[in-house]
Amino acid sequence: MTLDFSLSGNTVLKNINLILNIDRVNFKLHTSLRISGEQWDEEKKRPKNIYLKKYKKLNNKLDSLKKELVLHLNQRQIQKKEINQKSLSRAIQRIMDGNKELQLENSLLSLIKSYIVDRNDFICYSTYKRYKVFYNLIQRFEGYIMKHLFIEDVNMEFVKKFIAFGKEEKYSENTIYRTIHFVKTILNFVEKKGVRTSVREMNIKREKQQKEIVTLSEKEILKIKNTDLPQDLKAAKDWLIISCYTGQRFSDFMKFSIDKMVEINGKTCIKFTQQKTKKKVILPLHPSVKNVIQRNENSFPEPLDIVTYNKQIKLIAKIAGINHTLSARKRVGHRAKSFIMEKWETITSHIGRRSFATNFYGKIPTPLLIQATGHSSEQIFLKYINSADKEYIVSLSNHFLKMYNNKIKDSTELTKS
């Protein structure tokens, strides 16, 4: 059996027809769905841009139609009922009239939904969005195999087919394997409810991609500090310096304000709650951050939105001459690909966090700071940086001051020579 879609009609909006072949008998069936011929991918038999809202919705309908029709055909074969043009047209009409995709009990998608609901009070919005990405990917995979997946279908055969699907659709290996591991999480969730699954046979070694991490070195940060810039770029420059010496996410450092500053054992700190993790943080301020505050009349710079900030820090790095070439990933269409580009082009709001971890790793004792290059490392890093222990705060602040004074000393000696 094969099932595909084709367009017909002489108007701008074309009719989408379903072409079904069963035992060498062809059926051409009307679906009531329409699309512009220019927006149709003739090779993949679907909209070209399945990520644009209206075409994503249309593609979901096409995937749902395939799954429901195959389910209908299987039921008629079991019941030994005739499959003809009339019965197929009625089935398509019934499927198209349904407002929502059929959610079958104990299907993989229904269990993923149940898991998300179960975890809803314990996860942040970014985690919820990531779960939805996994859900949508499994939903798309079901359309690809034209079948509803149930727990008994999730095994090593499922893994092989899903990997093949992911590679055909040009998803990164990271996306493919993270989705598979999420499905394993769902199986463990189901097992706790007393349902037997194949989770134990799914011994999958996660294939790690060589991640291209871009950071600013101490010399490059100094170069940015010493670069004269137009007035409209000075706030972004100051925030970039702040991010490189606090190591926090954009959502946190852009909300820094004087009223969040506290004194602990004579050390100036900033006290805040991280937006993503909801963890309370007390962080001693590096002298470079204090200098930025003093330059801004004992205040933090004016806050910027993330689009403006990302645009301006690229320009700042370009003006500062941070332009050597490197390999980095850039989004083209709907997928990220590796390109050789100038470093300033790769700079985004997260570079301060990565630079902080990289520049201080090995110079400050690892119990205080760990290089944040991945999720597991970041968790350890956050664990220590979130400690409210006063000895930790004083110790980290002293290390900041010692390194800063040494740098000033070296710079002075260089000038004298």
What are these regions (language model features)?
Residues 322, 398-417:
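C-terminal secondary-structure termini that scaffold catalytic or DNA-interacting sites
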Residues 299, 303, 314-371:
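Short, basic (Lys/Arg/His-rich) helix/loop patches that form interaction surfaces
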Residues 255-292:
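Conserved tyrosine-mediated DNA breakage-rejoining catalytic core shared by Y-recombinases
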Residues 64-80, 106-135, 193-194:
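Short, aromatic/basic-rich helix-turn unit that serves as a nucleic-acid recognition element
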